[in-house]
Curated annotation (Swiss-Prot):
Signal peptide region: none
Extracellular side, ranges: 71-460
The entry's keywords: Antibiotic resistance, Cell membrane, Membrane, Metal-binding, Transmembrane, Transmembrane helix, Zinc, Zinc-finger
All ranges on the Cytoplasmic side of the membrane: 1-49
Protein name, entry field: Membrane-associated protein TcaA
GO biological process entries: response to antibiotic
Keyword Transmembrane: yes
Organism phylogeny: Bacteria, Bacillati, Bacillota, Bacilli, Bacillales
Function description: Plays a major role in decreasing resistance to glycopeptide antibiotics.
Topology term for the membrane: Single-pass membrane protein
Amino acid sequence: MKSCPKCGQQAQDDVQICTQCGHKFDSRQALYRKSTDEDIQTNNIKMRKMVPWAIGFFILILIIILFFLLRNFNSPEAQTKILVNAIENNDKQKVATLLSTKDNKVDSEEAKVYINYIKDEVGLKQFVSDLKNTVHKLNKSKTSVASYIQTRSGQNILRVSKNGTRYIFFDNMSFTAPTKQPIVKPKEKTKYEFKSGGKKKMVIAEANKVTPIGNFIPGTYRIPAMKSTENGDFAGHLKFDFRQSNSETVDVTEDFEEANISVTLKGDTKLNDSSKKVTINDREMAFSSSKTYGPYPQNKDITISASGKAKGKTFTTQTKTIKASDLKYSTEITLNFDSEDIEDYVEKKEKEENSLKNKLIEFFAGYSLANNAAFNQSDFDFVSSYIKKGSSFYDDVKKRVSKGSLMMISSPQIIDAEKHGDKITATVRLINENGKQVDKEYELEQGSQDRLQLIKTSEK
């Protein structure tokens, strides 16, 4: 369709004269218009053919860009760079994230110690070089799947391994720090509380038993901790250094505000060694001059005394108080017994014992003769006066005499004797009828006019 330039009437393209006003159309203009429409149509067809190619080319460009973006963040080299940057910049949180595994959570404080350990024991420049070379070799290798970075002394500090792929094209590199178990061995049952893996942790260690406190990555550690024992609560640190271990464990050094007590006794020469005790803060323990007692908290006073026995009587020292301000890691104290009081008592008891032993010597000399006469004559009356009537021993000897099973004895010796009220216990060494030397313990009762009678006996 075309419009008449004179009256505006619409007309077909092939009409040459306007039917309304008679205006004659220009045939060249119509021909040009037709040619132009055909060109436009041809160009449209060409454009429609080019669109798929343009879209495909655009998608290809996007894929190439995406590949390079993925490579920048996911290639082994890129993964290495992330770890290197974190260590170079002391980014402990990033290092903790990279090194944490399902089985071992690494917290930021551990990561901080680890970063410092790498810089001290490997050197940052050497570590970066070793890491890049290791990753490059693993990436190119078809057989190797893991390798270690080591310190100057040859200890493993980082395990680098291939762990599948990322986005099909790139090897996935895993960075894992090897771990060791720090171990404690307290002298008494101890509870330790500290922070590990970002969480509070409690470990209970039995006395004189090796106990691990967890798994830690390489480093030189000084961990704030609290420990509790029967003696009290202590604030301090648990210290351990991977440089000091060539095994799977590392010894822990305890650094707490504690006092250890060495005790010296004076005036105790007459006391039985096995009876000597030390009482610290109401807790009684056996005494040893070579033993150190503790540890005890340095922030609390300590009360201490000692006791011991001589001839059955207990003697004690005065109780001393050690002020908290005077407590040191190694604290010495001397406790004094009243030696004169002890010696006077021992002398008195020895006189009594000598008198008692003399009585017993006389008694058992007569008893052994009576016993043998009863055996030879099969007559209980010979020995009955030496045994208390109604006692189980009385009935037993009477039965043995009647059966002829009474044992003959000779050469009685008094080894030891003690008197408690009207009861006496005596250890007597005898020769039996087989000629063998035996020790027997007798219990006697002292009646009126100091008369002694046997109540019971037993083998020592």
